[in-house]
Regions:
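Membrane-cytosol interface motif
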Residues: 110, 114, 165-185, 335-358, ...
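N-terminal hydrophobic signal-anchor/signal peptide
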Residues: 1-28, 32, 100-105, 151-318
Length: 490
C-alpha cells in the first residue's frame, strides 16, 4: 500500500489562507504609505517629506500633544502611521471565504473600503489646517492602496483556484447530511473547492442525482473513484455507525494521501455555522463541554476589552443621549427608555436598558412577540436607531457591570428561551457564555420570525461559542462598526 501513496501538493487550511491574505494586505498598505509619501514629496516640488515627519515627531510637537495643546489624531505623521491600520479595518469583510475567492466581490469590497476611507478623511479635512494633513498624500495612499490591494487579491484568487490549491471532494453518504452539503454547495455558489459527487452503498441511489451531484457508486469502488477523479478530500456525511467495509475503504484512501473530513467541519467552513440538525449528542458533549473551555488569559483579555469598550461606549452614549431623547420625545412621546429581564451566562437574570424604538402599546397584551423585518410597531425614529444600533448603547452599562460582553449571543427573555429550548435542539448551549451587544449571529443574520430561522441563528451562536478568540471578537466588532456606518442594522 505504501508504494501507491500519491504525492499531493501542499494545500493550506482556510485559516492559513486568511493569514496569507492578512500579511499580503498589510504589506500592500505599508508600500502604499511609502508610495504616497514619495508622491506628496514630488507634488510639493521640494523635499518637504523629511521636514514634515521630523517636525511631527519633534520633542516640541510631542510636548504640545502630551500637554493636550494639540490633538494627536490631527497630526500628519500620526495619520500616516495609522493609515495602514485604518485600511486593514476597512478590509475586514474581505476575509470571508465567499468574498476572498470571488474577483467580483473582492473588487466591490475594495471599492467600498476606498469610498468609506475617502468619506471619513473628507470629514477630517474640514476640521484640519493645511499644514496638519498632507491631503495629496492621503489621496495618493487611497489610490495606491486600492490598486495594489486589488492586484494582490487577484493574484491570490488565481493561485487559490489553481489545480494545486483547489480541493476535489467526494461525499461519503447521500443521505440527509450529504444532501445538505450538496444543497449548500449549489446555493452558495462557492468555487473554492469542487464537490464531484457522492458514494453510497444504497443501490437505489446509485445513478441518481441530488442537487445536481451524482451518486457515482458504492464504497467498494471508492479507491477507483479517488484515482479516476483526482479526489483530494473525502467528507464523511453518514449519521450513525460506519459499516466495516466502508470504514476500511476510507482508511485505505487516507493511506493514499487523501484528507478525511467530517460533515460538520465542511459545513462550518462553508457557512460559519454549526449543523445542529446533523449532530449526535456525543459530538455536542465533546465540542460544547470539553472543547468549549477557553484559556483564562482569553477570559481576562476579553474582560479588559469589555471594560475599555464599556467606558468608551458610555461616553458616546452620554454624548448622543440628549439628541436621541429629544427625537424620541417628539416622535412618540415618553418613555425614552424601556427595560426588560434577560438571561445571561448560566441562566442568571439581569435587567437591560435600551432606547425605546417601538410604540408604547407594542406588547399591550403582555405576551412576548418576536420583532419582524419592517415591523409596524417600530417608530420612525426607532427604525433609524435600530439600523444604526444606537438603541443598544444603554447596554454598555450592562457590559461595565459584567452582565454582558461586547461580543456574544443575543440576550433573550426567559419566556422566549423556555419556548425555544422545547423546539430547537441545544438551544440552552447559548447560555455557556455571556450575552453580547453584538455577535456572530447578529452580523450574519437578521430578524428571525420562525423556528427554522431561529435554528439558523442558533447555529451561528454555537459556531461562535466553539471558535471564539480575541481576533474573532475584534472582527465582529469591526463588522458591527461597518453596519453602523452603512445603516444596515436589523
Amino acid at each position: 500500500m505504501a508504494d501507491n501513496i500519491r504525492t499531493t501538493p501542499l494545500r493550506l487550511r482556510p485559516s492559513e489562507h486568511r493569514m496569507i491574505l492578512f500579511v499580503g494586505d498589510l504589506l500592500t498598505a505599508i508600500i502604499s504609505v511609502i508610495a504616497a509619501l514619495y508622491t506628496w514629496r514630488q507634488y510639493s516640488n521640494y523635499n518637504k517629506t523629511i521636514e514634515y515627519i521630523a517636525d511631527g515627531l519633534s520633542q516640541a510637537r510631542i510636548d504640545r500633544i502630551l500637554s493636550l495643546q494639540e490633538p494627536f489624531y490631527l497630526q500628519g505623521p500620526f495619520w500616516f502611521l495609522l493609515l495602514p491600520v485604518i485600511w486593514m479595518i476597512l478590509l475586514v469583510e474581505l476575509y470571508e471565504p465567499h468574498v476572498a475567492g470571488s474577483g467580483r466581490k473582492t473588487t466591490r469590497g475594495i471599492a467600498i473600503a476606498a469610498f468609506i476611507g475617502l468619506l471619513a478623511y473628507s470629514l477630517v479635512f474640514i476640521f484640519s489646517q493645511e499644514t496638519n494633513l498632507p491631503r495629496v498624500g492621503v489621496g495618493a495612499f487611497l489610490l495606491f492602496a486600492s490598486l495594489l490591494t486589488l492586484g494582490w487579491r487577484m493574484l491570490f484568487i488565481r493561485a487559490y483556484k489553481s489545480t494545486g490549491q483547489r480541493r476535489r471532494i467526494l461525499l461519503i453518504g447521500a443521505g440527509m447530511a450529504g444532501q445538505t452539503l450538496a444543497e449548500l454547495y449549489q446555493s452558495l455558489g462557492t468555487r473554492s473547492f469542487n464537490i464531484v459527487g457522492f458514494i453510497d452503498d444504497d443501490i437505489k441511489k446509485i445513478g441518481k442525482k441530488f442537487h445536481e451531484l451524482p451518486v457515482m457508486g458504492s464504497s467498494d469502488r471508492l479507491l477507483q473513484m479517488v484515482d479516476a477523479y483526482r479526489i483530494t478530500d473525502l467528507v464523511v456525511a453518514i449519521n450513525g455507525e460506519i459499516q466495516g467495509a466502508t470504514f476500511q475503504s476510507i482508511l485505505d484512501a487516507q493511506e493514499k494521501g487523501v484528507d478525511i473530513t467530517r460533515m460538520p467541519i465542511l459545513y462550518e467552513e462553508m457557512t460559519g455555522r454549526v449543523p445542529i440538525h446533523h449532530l449526535e449528542s456525543d459530538w455536542i458533549i465533546r465540542s460544547f463541554v470539553d472543547e468549549v473551555r477557553v484559556s483564562g488569559l482569553y477570559e481576562l483579555a476579553k474582560r479588559l476589552l469589555d471594560i475599555i469598550g464599556g467606558f468608551v461606549g458610555m461616553i458616546i452614549f452620554l454624548f448622543f443621549l440628549p439628541f436621541i431623547s429629544l427625537a424620541i420625545l417628539i416622535n412618540s412621546g415618553l418613555p425614552i427608555f424601556y427595560s426588560q429581564t434577560r438571561l445571561g451566562r448560566g441562566a442568571a437574570k439581569f435587567t437591560i436598558y435600551k432606547f425605546r424604538t417601538m410604540r408604547q402599546d407594542a406588547e399591550q397584551d403582555g405576551e412576548a412577540k418576536l420583532a419582524e423585518k419592517n415591523d409596524p410597531r417600530v417608530t420612525r425614529v426607532g427604525d433609524f436607531l435600530r439600523k444604526t444600533r444606537l438603541d443598544e448603547f444603554p447596554q454598555f452599562w450592562n457590559v461595565l457591570r459584567g452582565e454582558m460582553s461586547l461580543v456574544g449571543p443575543r440576550a433573550e427573555r426567559p419566556e422566549l428561551i423556555a419556548a425555544f429550548q422545547k423546539q430547537v435542539p441545544f438551544y440552552r448551549a447559548r447560555l455557556l457564555v455571556k450575552p453580547g451587544l453584538t455577535g456572530w449571529a447578529q452580523i450574519n443574520y437578521g430578524y428571525y420570525a420562525s423556528v427554522t430561522e431561529m435554528s439558523v441563528k442558533l447555529e451561528y451562536d454555537l459556531y461562535y461559542i466553539k471558535h471564539r478568540t480575541l481576533p474573532m471578537d475584534f472582527q465582529i466588532i469591526l463588522r458591527t462598526i461597518g453596519t453602523v456606518i452603512r445603516h444596515t442594522g436589523r
